[in-house]
Amino acid sequence: MPTLDAPEERLRKFKYRGKDASARRQQRIAVSLELRKAKKDEQALKRRNITDVSLDPSDQQTKGVSLTLQEIISGVNASDPELCFQATQAARKMLSREKNPPLKLIVDAGLIPRLVELLKSSLHPRLQFEAAWALTNIASGASELTRAVVVGGAIQPLVELLSSPHMTVCEQAVWALGNIAGDGPEFRDNVIASDAIPHLLTLVSSSIPVPFLRNIAWTLSNLCRNKNPYPSDHAVKQMLPALFYLLGHPDREVLSDTCWALSYLTDGCDARIGQVVDTGVLPRLVELMSSSELNILTPSLRTVGNIVTGTDHQTQLALDAGILGVLPQLLTHPRPSIQKEAAWALSNVAAGPRQHIQRLIACGALPPLVAVLKNGEFKVQKEAVWTVANFTTGGSVEQLIQLVQAGVLEPLINLLTIPDNKMVIIILDVLFFILQAAEKISQKENMCLLIEGLGGLDRIEALQLHENHQVALTALNIIERHFSEEEETVTAFRARDQDHKFLKDLTNTYHCCTTPKPGPRP
């Protein structure tokens, strides 16, 4: 487990004060890697073509015929096209069972080379279709099964079938290639190297049936998927115009997979983000962030969240496209997963220059942000804490005062009791910077009184005895730097300046913005 920085080093990292927003955002991206790895990807890597046997039209022709595995092996290798077709179809049906399909059994029987050969039977499109379907389902299995399909030489014949005049054959080839590409970057790049992308793009048109277009969008998303390495720049440039076109399609599954594709392409360096942003997709993505369909909202929000991890210019383009008109609303979404993504996106906006922070204030993001700090699920609260942390490290004194006036202190102080040492240290750093900002306008004592009145001083003092050395030192630093006056001095100050406008305004703000403290969190 990596060790935490020494207090001085950690504080130095937080002392950007708006001078290096790019470095601050990169620090946030590095920390968010843990969050990214923990996220469950809602999009399927592979899909098996399952058929309800009772609804399969081919059953009417083969009713009563049930071939054994040995008969299938013999038939698939037969020279008689009709016998070969029946055996290949029987193999496909076995592989299309909803439960426990014998994928490995078929592979171990050595049928893949013959199935690949049958893909080239241009005079028998029904046979091509059944062979492609069987290979699709084998490739939907574990990586070793997908590898068997690739090693068996299936990619190039499948790519050639993308030009088949028979739509069912062509669509099944698209599906098979999608499963192969979805296995990982190695096979994805094999598919790309076989010139699959230009063939796929010729299929994208307004006349294509929607179910077919769904398969194309999903396969393209798998060609955009995976890092280490990313897909090549050339491949990305080929796909982006088609993705831009698909982003305007009304079908929700097409939209979902297209948004996922864009989320994969933006989950990387600034140059990758720039390629996507330059296509002009941002206005449409912002529009889709208001979708009531979770399978569209999630990847569109993820994509925008990725974009604002980029350069200040890229973030500016996202702001100009209207993301701040949607993100505050998403903090109140009924799904915590959406709240978390929205807070993460806001944290990266807050990691930018002060003009970005000002736009965050102007859009009304602070009240819902404070609300999730108070009452959100812990995973959402953590992202909200990061937003506040980035805000305080880059914001001006005036902006920090607005943050305090929004009621941020009470929930932050309440979170000092959470069993997450990293978060506690970040919150302590936030309080440190707020006190520093107050000191710059000669209002530190008032801020100290406000923190004390909210129970903050007691909690910070208690943290000096925390078992975690970093937490204890950070708390001690705040006490020594900002709360070291004698009690008599503080008491005299309170009596003398009870009606001080600054303290009065903040106190009134807290009366208006805060609610009774919630009970202990589970």
UniProtKB/Swiss-Prot annotation:
GO cellular component: cytoplasm; nucleus
Tissues expressing this chain: Expressed almost exclusively in ovary, in germinal vesicle (GV)-stage oocytes, but not in granulosa, nor theca cells. Detected at very low levels in testis.
Pfam annotation, one family: Arm
Entry-linked InterPro entries: ARM-like, ARM-type_fold, Arm_3, Armadillo, Importin-a_IBB, Importin-a_IBB_sf, Importin_alpha, PBS_lyase_HEAT
GO biological process, one term: NLS-bearing protein import into nucleus
Residue ranges annotated for the IBB domain, each copy included: 1-57
GO molecular function, one term: nuclear import signal receptor activity
Locations listed in the record: Nucleus
Keyword list, A-Z: Nucleus, Protein transport, Repeat, Transport
Lineage: superkingdom: Eukaryota
SUPFAM superfamilies (alphabetical): ARM repeat (SSF48371)
ARM repeats: 100-140, 143-182, 185-225, 228-267, 270-309, 312-351, 354-393, 397-436
Family indicated by similarity: Belongs to the importin alpha family.
Assembly behavior: Binds to importin subunit beta-1/KPNB1 via the IBB domain; this complex dissociates in the presence of RAN-GTP. Shows a limited binding to the RB1 nuclear localization signal (NLS), but not to the SV40, nor NPM1 NLSs. Interacts with RSL1D1. Binds to the NPM2 nuclear localization signal.
Role, per record: Functions in nuclear protein import.
Full protein name: Importin subunit alpha-8
Organism: Bos taurus
